[in-house]
């Protein structure tokens, strides 16, 4: 099979899976926002700042996002990713000052942009460079629409796809297709830290009950920012793998 034909087929399969997964999710009943979500364990006011630690623990996102933008601003998908990380720090900090659905929109919007940007990057680096570049802006638009749809209808189904499809698709891409750049270990570190962040989030209250020092949600922010830093280190240190080797491994 010719390499170009192989590439076209795998792109078609991947895009088809994306479309089918969205349609399948939309066939399920609507998902609404549980209002208990806003009831975080650590609600202390310190230095006049409500929910102090849940607010200030977003500073690492701002630092990582700013560093990424400074170093990677010439590559559109990477720049959008770090812009999403930077604005997540501001959006999440704003949300935690007064947790409610209205402020949660501004927390989730930059995250949706970041999720879609990193999916486009994974497609570009593992599946097909032109497809990844082409899908960047449609995916970003989909992320934005998912949040607008939630605010207009109360339905989180599309946002659920935006958040969780990359968590499934990116590992599959990494398993099935060879890398174009060195540094895959940074992606693995980022994935492990993100999984740890979700674990901290789930055990928010249980962690806070141990001494009432820091809550699980605060630790979630720190672990997630560390995952973003691992991705930053990947882009700072990656080196191209020889094209002919990558092509031979991909076609094999």
Residue ranges with predicted function:
Residues 148-181:
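Active-site rim beta-loop-alpha module in soluble metabolic enzymes
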Residues 3-136, 143-148, 152, 181-252:
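Early transmembrane hairpin module of multi-pass membrane proteins
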């Amino acid at each position: 099979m010719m390499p170009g034909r192989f590439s076209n087929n795998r792109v078609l399969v991947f895009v088809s899976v994306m479309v089918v997964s969205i349609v399948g999710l939309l066939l399920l009943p609507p998902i609404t926002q549980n209002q208990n979500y806003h009831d975080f364990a650590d609600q202390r006011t310190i230095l006049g700042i409500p929910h102090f630690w849940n607010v200030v623990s977003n500073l690492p996102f701002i630092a990582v996002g700013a560093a990424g933008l400074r170093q990677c601003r010439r590559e559109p998908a990477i720049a959008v990713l770090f812009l999403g990380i930077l604005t997540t720090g501001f959006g999440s900090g704003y949300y935690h000052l007064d947790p409610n659905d209205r402020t949660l929109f501004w927390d989730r919007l930059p995250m949706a942009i970041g999720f879609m940007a990193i999916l486009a990057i994974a497609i570009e680096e593992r599946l097909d460079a032109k497809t990844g570049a082409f899908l960047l802006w449609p995916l970003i638009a989909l992320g934005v629409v998912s949040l607008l749809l939630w605010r207009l209808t109360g339905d989180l189904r599309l946002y659920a796809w935006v958040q969780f499809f990359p968590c499934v698709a990116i590992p599959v891409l990494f398993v099935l297709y060879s890398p174009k750049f060195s540094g895959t270990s940074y992606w693995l570190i980022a994935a492990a830290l993100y999984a740890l962040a979700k674990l901290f989030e789930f055990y928010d209250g249980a962690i806070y009950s141990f001494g009432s020092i820091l809550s699980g949600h605060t630790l979630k922010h720190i672990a997630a920012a560390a995952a973003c830093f691992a991705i930053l280190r990947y882009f700072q240190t990656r080196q191209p793998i020889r094209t002919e080797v990558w092509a031979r491994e991909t076609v094999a």
